[in-house]
Amino acid sequence: VAMIMRFVSGAIGTFILSDQATSPWAWELGTGETVLFPKTGQNSVRFMGTNAALDFPNLALWHHGDEVPNWNHVISPDPIELELEDAYALQIAHFASVIAGREPPIITAADGTMTLRTTLAVFEAASMGHRVML
């Protein structure tokens, strides 16, 4: 799936997604956060903005330092250190805590609903050939 999204802020996001393509860039392979998948250490997502870019999940923040962003200026990465844990174990522990009433859900039903609305909007836009507003 390839899609372009315009956000409320005016930012434009370009997304290319596949759960079928064989590659080292799958989220679980990149993070190595579970022993179920062999770690490649490759980034699966890149966020690029006017002043900086972020590789994810390796968390290298690329920027021009104190200089104005420009192709002629040196751009350097600053690593952001983060210790990863087994995501599946953390998710099930959190789910159990939510069920027991010890903590609120990190992702709410409203978040899930919006994810579904967005997914359905992508399918509608692709099948109908027009932009879908959310």
What are these regions (language model features)?
Residues 1-60, 89-102:
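Contiguous beta-strand/loop segments that form the cofactor/metal-binding neighborhood of enzyme cores
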Residues 33-36, 76-77, 126-134:
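Juxtamembrane/interface motifs at transmembrane-helix termini
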Residues 8, 56-57, 94-134:
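C-terminal helix-rich "cap/oligomerization" subdomain common to oxidoreductases
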Residues 24-29, 65-71:
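A short, polar/proline- and glycine-enriched secondary-structure boundary/capping micro-motif
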Residues 72-83:
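C-terminal "lid/loop" region of Rossmann-like NAD(P)-dependent oxidoreductases
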Residues 45, 86, 90, 110-114:
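A generic "alpha-helical surface" signal
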